[in-house]
């Protein structure tokens, strides 16, 4: 372990008279026990905490999805990598010569490692749930829930439900309804947008979701906002489009929700009130981000919300592993940053739950 030096005990050695010298090991302490204790002490001096996993943490780490809620009928047979619809989407996306179709993170090897198709709402590439919370997951989720509900002025927690389908980890606290990371993130994002730009007061609200994933926010917003007139989902990853088509159909979202294929991006609407990008641009190249920003700018969308994976700045993910800043690229397209704040606004809470995501809200200048 770098920076940690372990002082080994004196090992008993033979004397010339056949007896051995007294060991400096504590009475009845085995070598393995001593090594474990010394390793933990050395790690602590280096700022590393070594601790035993509790049973709760072992359960969450053992599997990446919650299978306590069975899959709907036919889901396992349909949600397969060899589904003809997915194969067709992949071929169409691979044939595109646009930056949004060239992936630096969401490549086939990444998806094979980080996504179980039938359990796409589990802890995976779309929504980090258990791996991000680590030990004491239930306690950390409880604290995050209290923070989100404190700002739930729209009372979405009373309108939206969590059923745990497709592998979502759910948590129950007392008589409260089940919550999940999917649900809490959605409640938080919708309330934030309403507080900043009056989302619920816009007649015939139109939303563009770039990097929509499996359709999490589309499902929640269409269920919670009666003024929603149009919600378009688009994603540069064929698997995401495939899952989004399935999930929005399964949830029976209204016709106002559309899933637009990347190879038909010209079918996007001409007018939107807000564009959202949640944990997506951070996983794209700078060229792909600029391509998407051009689509936003040419429609003169008044508001743009970006939630990156990086806590310090808006950054891309390049093939060589570098992460390039792209805030200026947003500003260069006629936008100004009007608000940035942590998604959890208590400094003490963020340290306890170790979630440091930020909201970045931009407004088009001159509106």
Model-derived segments and their meaning:
Residues 203-213:
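Conserved class I S-adenosyl-L-methionine
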Residues 1-96:
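Membrane-proximal basic amphipathic "stem/tether" segments
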Residues 94-200:
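Conserved Class I S-adenosyl-L-methionine-dependent methyltransferase catalytic core
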Residues 245-269:
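S-adenosyl-L-methionine
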Residues 284-295:
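A short, conserved alpha-helix within the catalytic core of class I
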Residues 230-235:
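Conserved SAM-binding motif I beta-strand of class I
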Residues 300-312:
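Conserved beta-strand signature within the Rossmann-like core of class I S-adenosyl-L-methionine
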Residues 215-226:
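Conserved SAM-binding loop of SAM-dependent methyltransferases across substrates and taxa
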């Amino acid at each position: 372990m770098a920076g940690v030096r372990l002082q080994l005990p004196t090992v008993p050695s033979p004397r010339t008279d056949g007896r051995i010298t007294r060991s400096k090991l504590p009475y009845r302490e085995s070598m393995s026990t001593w090594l474990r204790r010394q390793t933990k002490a050395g790690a602590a001096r280096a700022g590393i905490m070594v601790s035993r996993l509790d049973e709760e943490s072992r359960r969450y780490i053992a599997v990446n999805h919650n299978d306590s809620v069975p899959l709907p009928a036919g889901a396992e047979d349909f949600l397969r990598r060899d589904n003809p619809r997915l194969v067709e989407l992949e071929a169409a996306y691979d044939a595109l010569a646009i930056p949004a179709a060239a992936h630096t993170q969401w490549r086939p090897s990444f998806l094979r490692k980080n996504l179980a198709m039938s359990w796409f709402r589990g802890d995976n590439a779309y929504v980090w749930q258990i791996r991000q919370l680590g030990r004491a997951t239930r306690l950390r989720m409880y604290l995050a829930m209290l923070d989100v509900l404190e700002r739930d002025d729209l009372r979405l927690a009373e309108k939206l439900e969590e059923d745990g389908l497709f592998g979502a980890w759910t948590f129950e606290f007392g008589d409260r309804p089940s919550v999940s990371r999917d649900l809490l993130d959605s409640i938080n994002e919708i309330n934030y947008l309403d507080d900043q730009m009056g989302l619920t007061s816009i007649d015939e609200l139109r939303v563009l979701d770039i990097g929509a994933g499996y359709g999490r926010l589309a499902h929640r917003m269409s269920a919670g906002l009666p003024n929603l007139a149009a919600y378009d989902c688009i994603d540069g990853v064929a698997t995401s489009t495939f899952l989004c088509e399935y999930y929005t159909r399964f949830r029976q979202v209204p016709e106002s929700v559309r899933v637009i294929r990347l190879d038909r991006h010209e079918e996007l609407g001409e007018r939107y009130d807000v564009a959202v990008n949640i944990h997506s641009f951070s996983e794209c190249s700078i060229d792909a981000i600029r391509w998407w920003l051009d689509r936003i700018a040419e429609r003169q969308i008044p508001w743009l919300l970006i939630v990156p994976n990086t806590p310090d700045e808006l950054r891309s993910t390049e093939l060589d592993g570098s992460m390039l800043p792209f805030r200026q690229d947003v500003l260069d397209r006629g936008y100004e940053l009007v608000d940035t704040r942590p998604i959890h606004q208590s400094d003490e809470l963020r340290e306890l739950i170790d979630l440091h995501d930020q909201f970045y809200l931009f407004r088009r200048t001159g509106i």
